[in-house]
């Protein structure tokens, strides 16, 4: 099959679900925690998250407009980041899958997703918000830039957030004797298309020729 999102629109594939989302897989989950200037905590997963560079370590994620008002306002996460200059990435894992899923629910402004998801707040070294204590790895990230990108569709306009990693927290029990992270024990969760997810339970190594 072939379809042209540029010519005929993103939904011109004629399938019941979007094949694009199921082709760009697996995607790391941006489980992002923030706090507002007046101290209201927020936690939400974003399925379009990725690292940009490793030296200095920088990351990015995309947030669509809020679904609570038909896409007319920006997400609480984005507003909090621009207000405080910080956000935290928390590694989503298989064991935390239910908490990740619960934190995806769009709650009214000011309701605490940490409490709703049933996870614990841990203090940060520099970021004003909290990190997920149960997560094996957390990044404290300093806000660098946001790009508000129009798409021509009023309900799919999005914000691209770029940040620089200032602090990395790793639970000691997940560092192997050879200094590598024990990924197979962590079982990182990743996003697929539809309502599907996967997690890392197999690895292979390829030496560059």
Regions found by a protein language model. Give the residues of each.
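Basic, polyanion-binding surface patches
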Residues: 1-207
């Amino acid at each position: 099959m072939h379809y042209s999102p540029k010519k005929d629109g993103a939904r011109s594939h004629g399938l019941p679900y979007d094949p694009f989302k199921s082709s760009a897989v697996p995607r790391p989950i941006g489980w992002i925690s923030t706090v507002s200037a007046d101290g209201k905590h927020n936690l939400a997963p974003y399925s379009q998250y990725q690292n940009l560079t490793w030296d200095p370590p920088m990351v990015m994620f995309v947030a669509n407009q809020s679904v609570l008002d038909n896409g007319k306002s920006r997400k609480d996460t984005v507003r909090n980041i621009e207000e405080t200059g910080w956000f935290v990435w928390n590694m989503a894992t298989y064991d935390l899958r239910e908490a990740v899923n619960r934190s995806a629910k769009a709650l009214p402004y000011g309701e605490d997703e940490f409490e709703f998801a049933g996870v614990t707040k841990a203090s940060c070294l520099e970021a004003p918000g909290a990190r997920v204590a149960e997560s094996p790895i957390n990044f404290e990230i300093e806000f660098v830039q946001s790009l508000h990108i129009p798409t021509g569709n009023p309900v799919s306009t999005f914000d691209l957030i770029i940040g620089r990693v200032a602090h990395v927290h790793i639970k000691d029990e997940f560092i192997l004797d050879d200094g590598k992270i024990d990924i197979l024990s962590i079982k990182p969760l990743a996003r697929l298309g539809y309502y599907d997810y996967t997690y890392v339970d197999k690895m292979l190594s390829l030496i560059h020729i």
